[in-house]
């Protein structure tokens, strides 16, 4: 072969290598596709890239991924804690210690409303334009809206609650977008053996967010102690006290942006998710390879016979794989696919389980005032003592129930499995809510405290963690984000129902019948028990995804065979079927 032809081949090889490179990659998200960009066969390149992800061990790379992906959940839970305490602080500034009930509900529910929009909107968008192009956008929305909240002030022309509610709805859109994106990106980058633990650890950042909020609140209350402790009631909170409270809630909410800003670079520079790049964008590459068949004559005319043979083999492989590739994502195909019961029941199971859980998960907070009173961290009218007790009391409850539950899930979800943990959690919670509801007045304060902590534990070592993990694994790549968004949005709808409709039931006819406040709380707990019972049945619809690759899950539960796996099997079958005489003849 002449030196000119050799140079031409080397240039062509470098060009092909460059053609297969993808953008992005940083310390938290390694670009596995670029490790195999030199492989010309798209199916072989796909197989090797996915194998390198699935077989990877657990190390610092995964710890960094957990940190970067988990910051959104940390910010979300931090904000929930901050706004609950912030509302108390605001009430001293604008309402002499007693914010109207509708205003409180509006500020608390507004974030959930935005979250529903973000979960569905960003979830769908990530399947249309890709994960890389929008990952980080939701964090930018959260950061900007959090900063804007700290600048809101009251004036005759501007309603304080209305403006703050608007910013919280928009911030909720960012928070909602983080649910499907962080879940599916973590899932698609995670090693098969520890995928559940990695996804669970991302979600467990919620506990750290609540703890961070409590610690920062304690520091702020201690720092402003001199401006608060002399006010023994909201009426006694004068201009000095009001200024301190006004500064505290703004600092408390504003500090929620710090970790988000620190992690923003890593989100904006991630590579495209390998599964999305290979599953959704692969058809274009395979179609281009198939066009080589049209140039078969031109290939034979070249002086390099080996290049011609290789070109024909690649074209043949591409044509074969096109027939086995999943259909292109579209609304019509989505309806066709999930309109079939064997596929649609999985979406019903994930969405239904998340809905039933969140009704009770957010409704359980209705008992918080009673629980804090029991452990001696409620009841004081002194401004300093009330803020201090609220922060410390909630920290105790989080560390007693929520935090252990999250991490027991993380350490066992890849051993026990997702479905058994979720099923057992719903069964135990059904029993616990029945006890709380039907024996409420016989339990006593300490009995109620014990059951409250146990409920918190089994919600997190149970469906609260698994309802986040399973939707990120059990759907085809082209609809994984959309389906996760639908499931998560269903949960938030349940939360809104709990905070509005069921939340108001606790005082149903109490004043009319001359009964104390919260007289209907036991019956509300019984309603929550019914939702937990429904969760048992929705859990039966979901598959077990433990220790299976995403491609194996797709083949098992959606009947879509990975083209690279099929190609690899066919090659092995061809080798095994070849007789020794044939192999000797070929040699």
Curated annotation (Swiss-Prot):
The modification Phosphothreonine is found at residues 302, 317. Residues 1-67, 130-133, 178-201, 272-345, 417-419, 464-485, 544-587 are extracellular. Changing residue 492 to E: Reduces transport activity. Reduces affinity for inorganic phosphate. Significantly reduces growth rates under low phosphate conditions. No significant effects on growth rates under high phosphate conditions. This is Inorganic phosphate transporter PHO84. Changing residue 160 to C: Reduces phosphate binding, transport and signaling activities. Phosphorylated; phosphorylation increases after phosphate addition to the growth medium. Ubiquitinated in a phosphate-dependent manner; ubiquitination may influence the trafficking of PHO84 to the cell membrane and serve as a signal for endocytosis and internalization. It comes from the Eukaryota. The gene is PHO84. One of its GO terms (molecular function) is phosphate transmembrane transporter activity. Present with 335000 molecules/cell in log phase SD medium. Disruption phenotype: Genetic disruption is not lethal. Largely abolished phosphate uptake capacity in phosphate-starved cells. Reduced phosphate uptake in high phosphate conditions. Constitutive expression of PHO5, a repressible acid phosphatase. Increased resistance to manganese, zinc, cobalt and copper under metal surplus conditions. Decreased manganese uptake. PROSITE patterns: MFS, SUGAR_TRANSPORT_1, SUGAR_TRANSPORT_2. May function as a monomer. It is found in: Cell membrane; Vacuole. There is a cross-link at residues 6, 298 (Glycyl lysine isopeptide (Lys-Gly) (interchain with G-Cter in ubiquitin)). Changing residue 408 to C: Reduces signaling activity and enhances transport activity. The keyword Translocase does not apply. Changing residue 358 to E: Abolishes transport activity. Causes pronounced increase in secreted phosphatase activity under high phosphate conditions. Moderately decreases signaling activities. Significantly reduces growth rates under low phosphate conditions. Changing residue 434 to S: No significant effect on transport activity. It catalyses: phosphate(in) + H(+)(in) = phosphate(out) + H(+)(out); Mn(2+)(in) = Mn(2+)(out); Zn(2+)(in) = Zn(2+)(out); Cu(2+)(in) = Cu(2+)(out). Changing residue 145 to S: No significant effect on transport activity.
């Amino acid at each position: 072969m002449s030196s000119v032809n050799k140079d031409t081949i080397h240039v062509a090889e470098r060009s092909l290598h460059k053609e297969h490179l993808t953008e992005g990659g940083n310390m938290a998200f390694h670009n596995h596709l670029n490790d195999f960009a030199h492989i010309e066969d798209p199916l072989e390149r796909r197989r090797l890239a996915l194998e390198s992800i699935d077989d990877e061990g657990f190390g610092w790379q995964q710890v960094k991924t957990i940190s970067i992906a988990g910051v959104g959940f940390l910010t979300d839970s931090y904000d929930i804690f901050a706004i609950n305490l912030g509302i108390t602080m605001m009430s001293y500034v604008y309402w002499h210690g007693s914010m109207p009930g509708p205003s409180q509900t509006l500020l608390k529910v507004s974030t959930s409303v935005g979250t529903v929009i973000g979960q569905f909107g960003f979830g769908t968008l990530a399947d249309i334009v890709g994960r890389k192009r929008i990952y980080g956008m939701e964090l930018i929305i959260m950061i900007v809206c959090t900063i804007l909240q700290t600048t809101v002030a009251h004036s005759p022309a501007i309603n304080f609650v209305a403006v703050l509610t608007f910013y919280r709805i928009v911030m909720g859109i960012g928070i909602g977008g983080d649910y499907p994106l962080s879940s599916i990106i973590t899932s698609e980058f995670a090693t098969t053996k520890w995928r559940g633990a990695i996804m669970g650890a991302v979600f467990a950042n919620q506990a750290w967010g609540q703890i961070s909020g409590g610690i920062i609140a304690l520091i702020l209350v201690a720092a402003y102690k001199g401006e608060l402790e002399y006010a023994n009631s909201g009426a006694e909170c004068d201009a000095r006290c009001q200024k301190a409270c006004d500064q505290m809630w703004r600092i408390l909410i504003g500090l929620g942006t710090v970790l988000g800003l620190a992690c923003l670079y890593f989100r904006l520079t991630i590579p495209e998710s390998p599964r999305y790049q290979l599953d959704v964008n692969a058809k274009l590459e395979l179609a281009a390879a198939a066009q080589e068949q049209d140039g078969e004559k031109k290939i034979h005319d070249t002086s390099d016979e080996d290049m011609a043979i290789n070109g024909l083999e690649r074209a043949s492989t591409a044509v074969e794989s096109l027939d086995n590739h999943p259909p292109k994502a579209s609304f019509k195909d989505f309806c066709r696919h999930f309109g079939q019961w064997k596929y649609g029941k999985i979406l019903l199971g994930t969405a239904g389980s998340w809905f039933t859980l969140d009704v009770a998960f957010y409704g359980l907070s209705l008992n918080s005032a009673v629980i804090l009173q029991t452990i001696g961290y409620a009841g004081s009218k002194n401004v300093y003592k009330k803020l201090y007790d609220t922060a410390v009391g909630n920290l105790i409850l989080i560390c007693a129930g929520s935090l252990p539950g999250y991490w027991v899930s993380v350490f066992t979800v890849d051993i026990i499995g997702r479905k058994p943990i979720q099923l057992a959690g719903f069964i135990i919670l059904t029993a616990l809510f029945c006890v709380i509801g039907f024996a409420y007045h016989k339990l006593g304060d300490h009995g109620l405290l014990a059951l409250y902590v146990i409920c918190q534990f089994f919600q997190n070592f149970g469906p609260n963690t698994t309802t986040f993990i399973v939707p990120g694994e059990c759907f085809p790549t082209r609809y994984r984000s959309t389906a996760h968004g639908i499931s998560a949005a269903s949960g938030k709808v349940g939360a809104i129902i709990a905070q509005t409709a069921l939340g108001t039931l606790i005082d149903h006819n109490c004043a009319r019948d001359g009964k104390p406040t919260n007289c209907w709380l036991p019956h509300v707990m019984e309603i929550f028990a019914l939702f937990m019972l429904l969760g048992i049945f929705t859990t039966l619809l979901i598959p077990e995804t433990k220790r299976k690759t995403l491609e194996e899950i797709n083949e098992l539960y959606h009947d879509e065979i990975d083209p690279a796996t099929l190609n690899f099997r066919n090659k092995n079958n061809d080798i095994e079927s070849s007789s020794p005489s044939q192999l000797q003849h070929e040699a």
